[in-house]
């Protein structure tokens, strides 16, 4: 019995279709088991059905924010169920997720922001300070930052909420309050 040559083996592999989205493929392959656990983290279990829903919603949200096909989205996120939903959601939207190690320095992230040309960053709340530092060091301007599992409580100088207090007035201005505001 003879072993097929590399050329013969390659010729027998079917070509990819003209349009192929790996995230859509992965979600479709697992559509028949929506209740099965896909990922588990310290906050709980994410089923395949929930992964499908979260990835599609995140992808739609990224597109609604104005991100376009093949633009980069930096994923500076701790391990957890938000990570695969974000990775697949970006891919589902036709974006390019850029996965990075969470143990690096602000200088490393500044370099990655500049060289990946990321238009958005999905960041774990605990890593937001290092991202902010990286963005001040980078010449590349990120358009959108989305925080996963933001940290609380807020610093006294941060606004907790805004409300427009006068309806239908051209002079309406938002009024905000933070922890140290008297009211």
For every predicted segment, state its role:
Residues 24-50, 153, 182:
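AMP-dependent adenylate-forming
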Residues 35, 152, 168-183:
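Conserved pre-ATP/AMP-binding loop-to-beta segment of ANL
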Residues 26, 85-86, 131:
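Aromatic/hydrophobic pocket-lining residues that form π-stacking "cages" and hydrophobic walls in ligand
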Residues 77-79, 124-125, 181:
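Helix N-cap/beta->alpha junction signal
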Residues 37-80, 84-88, 105-110, 162-163:
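Conserved AMP-binding/adenylate-forming core of the ANL superfamily
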Residues 1-20:
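Flexible, non-catalytic linker and terminal segments flanking ANL/adenylate-forming cores
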Residues 64-65, 92-166, 176:
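Structural core segment of the AMP-binding/adenylate-forming
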């Amino acid at each position: 019995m003879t072993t097929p040559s590399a050329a013969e083996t390659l010729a027998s592999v079917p070509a990819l279709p003209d349009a192929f989205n790996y995230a859509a493929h992965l979600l479709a392959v697992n559509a028949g088991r929506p209740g099965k656990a896909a990922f588990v983290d310290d906050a709980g279990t994410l089923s395949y059905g929930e992964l499908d829903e979260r990835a599609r919603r995140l992808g739609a949200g990224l597109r609604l924010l104005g991100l376009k096909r093949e633009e980069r989205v930096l994923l500076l996120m701790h391990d957890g169920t938000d990570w695969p939903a974000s990775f697949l959601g970006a891919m589902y939207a036709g974006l390019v997720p850029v996965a990075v190690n969470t143990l690096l320095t602000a200088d490393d992230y500044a370099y990655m922001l500049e060289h990946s040309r990321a238009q958005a960053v999905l960041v774990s709340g605990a890593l937001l300070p290092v991202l902010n530092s990286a963005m001040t060091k980078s010449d590349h301007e990120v358009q959108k930052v989305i925080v996963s599992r933001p940290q609380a409580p807020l610093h006294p100088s941060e606004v907790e909420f805004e409300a427009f207090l006068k309806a239908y007035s051209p002079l309406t201005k938002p009024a905000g309050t933070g922890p140290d505001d008297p009211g």
